[in-house]
């Protein structure tokens, strides 16, 4: 039997459902999700393998107009995938009109010389007439290889999109073992799960100012639990107070919710300790960005 493989980038503005789509395809959480824009900060591979194919999806940070060094990192990280992949999924939301952000991405896609599939997500939120109007608008902007409407949240048409990708794969190598689902180490996934809970539970001023560093992660032979120590980094003392909460209640809630997800991922009992530290203006300091896992070497 001929084996086929290829790399597929998922690009789009923030909050269009890229990570939700990847997690649905993979059947488990690879990329964290929230309703906050710019939740994804790093490129994350989701490695989808069957007996006849391997599709390596690359989930990317939402492309936006950056205001910090962290924002620059995120946007360059996303665009760098255009040099690495065989196909691009350009994802747009069905319930929002085409905007300047979409046009900016389209101009880069036109210059990239790689096949682009337009994925219109969130079709569960609109009337079919609105969907058709949205598709026509984007079709007039560039020549897409395919246009596929989906609902990543409900799973509508997702398998059809995977089939289309599979049909267009070239014969190739199996780049990763069949049981490997991502390129990131467990420590990275743990830090992202803690950050996800911070995004879910705290107010608007917190999300973009938070980074999570896993200081240690090892199994305790006596308790047969994985002991994890993680530090939540913020930029201001006021943010530290919000995350800790009254009597430590918020930090305890963050830790409890994160621990459940981490246990599901690892298949082990977990003892999670979390601290909060202030690192002023870390989003504009390249050394701090590198220390917290946002390294220019990624692109």
Swiss-Prot record:
One Gene Ontology MF term: ribosomal small subunit binding
Among PROSITE patterns, the record links this protein to: G_ERA, KH_TYPE_2
**GO cellular component: a single term:** plasma membrane
Where is it mostly found?
Answer: cytoplasm
Q: Where is this region: G5?
A: 150-152
Q: Where is the KH type-2 domain?
A: 202-280
What residue spans carry the region label G1?
12-19
Question: What ranges does the record give for the region G3, renumbered to this chain?
Answer: 59-62
- Which residues are recorded as binding GTP? 12-19, 59-63, 121-124
Keyword Glycoprotein in record: no
Localization recorded for this chain is: Cytoplasm; Cell membrane
- Its membrane topology: Peripheral membrane protein
Q: Output the InterPro entries linked to this UniProt entry.
A: G_ERA_dom (IPR030388), GTP-bd (IPR006073), GTPase_Era-like (IPR005662), KH_dom-like_a/b (IPR015946), KH_dom_type_2 (IPR004044), KH_sf_prok-type (IPR009019), P-loop_NTPase (IPR027417), Small_GTP-bd (IPR005225)
Region of interest called G4, as start-end residue ranges on this chain: 121-124
Task: State the protein's purpose.
Answer: An essential GTPase that binds both GDP and GTP, with rapid nucleotide exchange. Plays a role in 16S rRNA processing and 30S ribosomal subunit biogenesis and possibly also in cell cycle regulation and energy metabolism.
Give the UniProt family note. Answer: Belongs to the TRAFAC class TrmE-Era-EngA-EngB-Septin-like GTPase superfamily. Era GTPase family.
Entries under PANTHER family matching the protein: GTPASE ERA, GTPASE ERA, MITOCHONDRIAL
Put simply, this protein is called GTPase Era
Q: Which organism is it from?
A: Streptococcus pneumoniae (strain Hungary19A-6)
């Amino acid at each position: 039997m001929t084996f086929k493989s290829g790399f597929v980038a998922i690009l789009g503005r923030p909050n269009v459902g890229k990570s939700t789509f990847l997690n649905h395809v993979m059947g488990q959480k690879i990329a964290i999700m929230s309703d906050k824009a710019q939740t994804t900060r790093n490129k994350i591979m989701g490695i989808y393998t069957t007996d006849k194919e391997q599709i390596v999806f690359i989930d990317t940070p939402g492309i936006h107009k950056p205001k910090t060094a962290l924002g620059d990192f995120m946007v360059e990280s996303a665009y760098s995938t255009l040099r690495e992949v065989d196909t691009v999924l350009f994802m747009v939301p069905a319930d929002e009109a085409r905007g300047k952000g979409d046009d900016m991405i389209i101009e880069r896609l036109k210059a990239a010389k790689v096949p682009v599939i337009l994925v219109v997500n969130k079709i569960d939120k609109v009337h079919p007439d609105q969907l058709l109007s949205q598709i026509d608008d984007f079709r007039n902007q560039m020549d897409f290889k395919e246009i596929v409407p989906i609902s990543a949240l409900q799973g509508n048409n997702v398998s059809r999109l995977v089939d289309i990708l599979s049909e267009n794969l070239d014969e190739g190598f199996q780049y990763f073992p069949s049981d490997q689902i991502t390129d990131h180490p467990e420590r990275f996934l743990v830090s992202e799960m803690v950050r996800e809970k911070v995004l879910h539970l705290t107010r608007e001023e917190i999300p973009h100012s938070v980074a999570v560093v896993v200081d240690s992660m090892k199994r305790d032979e006596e308790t047969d639990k994985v002991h994890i120590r993680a530090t939540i980094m913020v930029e201001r003392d006021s943010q530290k107070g919000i995350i800790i909460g009254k009597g430590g209640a918020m930090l305890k809630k963050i830790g409890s919710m994160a621990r459940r997800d981490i246990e599901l991922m690892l298949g082990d009992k977990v003892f999670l300790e979390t601290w909060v530290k202030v690192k002023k203006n870390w989003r504009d300091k390249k050394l701090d960005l590198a220390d917290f896992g946002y390294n220019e070497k990624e692109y």
